[in-house]
Amino acid sequence: MTNQQKLTISDIAKLANVSIATVSRYLNGQLNQMSEATAQKIKKIITETDYIRNSAAVQLAKKRSNLVAVVASNIDEYFSSEYFKGIVSILSAFGYIGVLLDSDSNLKTEKAHLESVYNQNFAGIILQPLTTDSAVIRKFLNHNMPIVLIDRELADLEMSSVTTNNFEIAKYAMAQLAPDSFSNVTVITEPVKKISTRVTRVAGIKTVFDQVNVIETRSEHFDVNQLATTVDLNNPQNLLVVLKERLLIQLLTHPSFLMQAHQTQNITGFIDTTMPRYLAPNFKFIQQSPYLMGASAAEILIKHLSSANNDYQQNIQNIIIPSHYK
């Protein structure tokens, strides 16, 4: 097999300077959803690179269920909706349908969804787990159901995953903020527990700041007024680092923030969309790429579904999609 034949949809999209979704539509014959010039450009690149669509995966889709379960920790989060779009853009190109199941930040709900997926005829699963109990996931592996984790890692299980560079980018961003300028550092996050994403972000922050106050809350219960009673939001020496965009937006839209002059940045965090940049155009944030993470997770799953003799566990992939502080 040549290098050209190993190209993915993501590669074709980059070469054509279009979105993954646009390439997916082209492959599905949905030419009415793009300009003729775009269609011709994609066609030219596919011809020049000898790109071969994974026909084995397409044939598999005809022989088994074409449903893929996508179990999200909470679809109210911008991150979840963005990565689901990325997942669907790839699955649809191979004849699969993504079925979104919302755990709603509730372990019992997640467990019920996983039981349902296990007992139903799903081709595979892409999971953003709340649980850190590897036994819950292991039975899928034992049943040989293809599974890919997104935004999470489980250290004691060997399985495919797509994450971002949480530790490295958190450490880098903190170093860029002139640490000596701050006397107090407060991290605002949903409950950390043992969730790998949150644990590694906090660890990255603590490599730069020795003393860090971690406030755990839930997006739907976050009260900025209550936070203001313990943290002086107007004091430029107080740094706030928010690990979820939804929490960050609640801070950026609060009157106490809107009334500040913002000569010095004292709020930053992880973001998934451009909204925080409109609210604080002079601030830098840690920009994730959830759409690309979702598309990458779907591509891995398609490869697993195409594995000879369903022996996908011999082809484990752990992909890191870098986030950027900008």
Where are the model-predicted features located?
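Amphipathic helical "hinge" segments at domain boundaries
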Residues: I52-L114, N121
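An alpha-beta-alpha
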Residues: A173-N213, N309-K326
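Flexible loop/turn connectors
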Residues: D232-L240, R246-K326
